[in-house]
Amino acid sequence: MADHADATKKDGRIPSPLHSLASSTASLGRSPPPALKMASSPDPRSHRGSFAEQMRGTPSSPRASRQPSLTQSALQELLNNPPTKGGDAKFQSRDWSSVRLGELVDPSLVRFVEYDTSVEDATSILVQHGAPNVILLRDTKDTRYATGTFDYSDLNAYLLLVVGLAHPDEEDVASFDELAKKGREGKPIPLRDVKEVGNKKEPLITLPHTADLTKAIEVFGSGVHRVLVAEEGTTDVIGVLTQLQLVKFFWENRQSFPDVDQLYPRLIKDLAIGSKTVLAINGDKPLASALELMNNEGVSSLPVLDAQNNVIGNISHVDVRLLTKSTSLPLLRSSCIHFISVILSERGMNDGKDSFPVFHVNPYSTLAHTVAKLVATRSHRMWVVDSPSPSSSGPPTPALQPASLVPPSPITPLPATHIGPTPVNSTSPTHLAGTGAVAPAISASAISGASLSGRLSGVISLTDVLNLFAKASGLHPHDPDEARRARRRSSSSSMRRSMDSARSESVSAIAGRRGSVNEREKNVQGLGIARGRGNA
């Protein structure tokens, strides 16, 4: 669920997840033993009850009389200030600004492919290896200079293309139609072809491995959601540092960094961080609408709401990995609520996790509570929901401004017929034209979302957290809200839907339309960075 669940790692080669996209489509009871008949049985009326009979009246559970191990105040303190692992000893007694980027990245997590790699093979690598959930593109195998990326947003856009829900500009219609036809026929599509029809992406930001964290936190606090780390004096990439990694680093080593640690006990409402402009989707809407919405608006996750705008779940672009089999395509017609149940089922079977991830906080949540949830769920954002005052004896809860649910761009109805010619081979996937039954799901109107969470009132992203950390440390990151406003302004003149995939986290928490990255490029100028070509 979230920008949030890593793909399961497996040893050895496994079939590509997109390979199947090109293929067709009471427990037992125990009976009591028979009663023994004795020659001289006493009168049943004078029979003394057996031990078993006397125990038929189930005694009360010991838990009913057991004293709680934690008082209410102690439990609240635990929620407000969750414990951490204690941090890495090598960072103790160090100023975080002296930590080098090379100390935080793992070269073994860098995955390269070339532009002639098929989308199918790239997807297989992406799903198998998990974090940092991105594949770097290079021109040849003998270089480690990255010129592009492929991530789950690209995969989402590709699937929408194949099923006929991508709508390019007029000059790209022919290219999109040809790619969609190849995808439905099971023909390999190189990443180079996907790159040709895509928009310009968030610029690739490259920092030397000797750069300190002040440089990275300024970039992240301005809205960029990942940076590449290269060997000093070269373009050879040795690591990828993400917003989530940096937030996790500060959280686990909080005791070592007092200027950041003093922020954790404060309440969200007092810090005044986040945005009240949120893009969301109703739980009764089809999953295809949610995926198209994320693609059109350039966001990586959406809150799923009931009829009263209460948060009842979360859908992330990473969850699109569950749709890479042709047998999963009917899910596109199912409701978002049903897809959430599929996500939870997959977590239980593959990850062995029975917990229900919680992606919301309230204005009275501490920053520590919020960051702990972001790290635990590996999410890029937490939805803020209305909540009553934490103490009935305190002042009444102030009127909380509800979230501004921005109307999204029009969603294309699911196609009723095949787009393009009928696939030429017998293993071609069944298109969405089929009228196969969709698994029934409970309606959003029947769910009491208020008891699950609360009414959506805003969102807090990793960008907001890192921007706060940067300011508290005396740095001057650019205001991510300005990039959000610029994005909304540019969207009014552009409704283009395309393969724009490496989007900025500074705009992923709000509902602005996808626009130019020129404003974000200005934001990172002067920070001593190197840029690569960001198209992929």
From Swiss-Prot:
The family database entries (Pfam families) matched by this protein are listed as: CBS
Gene3D superfamilies named in the record: CBS-domain
Which positions form S-S bridges? none
Question: Where would one find coiled-coil regions in this protein?
Answer: none
Q: Which GO terms describe its molecular function?
A: protein serine/threonine phosphatase inhibitor activity
- InterPro entries given for it? AMPK_gamma/SDS23_families, CBS_dom, CBS_dom_sf, Ssd23
**Cellular compartments per GO CC:** cytoplasm; nucleus
Q: Where is the composition biased (Polar residues)?
A: 57-71
> What are its GO biological-process terms?
cellular response to glucose starvation; regulation of mitotic metaphase/anaphase transition
Q: Where in or outside the cell is it found? A: Cytoplasm; Nucleus
Basic and acidic residues composition-biased segments: 1-13
Instruction: Recite the UniProt keywords alphabetically.
Output: CBS domain, Cytoplasm, Nucleus, Repeat
Positions of the CBS domain: 105-170, 198-256, 274-331, 335-391
Q: Where is this region: Disordered?
A: 1-71, 473-536
The text of the family note is: Belongs to the SDS23 family.
Q: What does this protein do?
A: Involved in DNA replication and cell separation.
Q: What is this protein called?
A: Protein SDS23
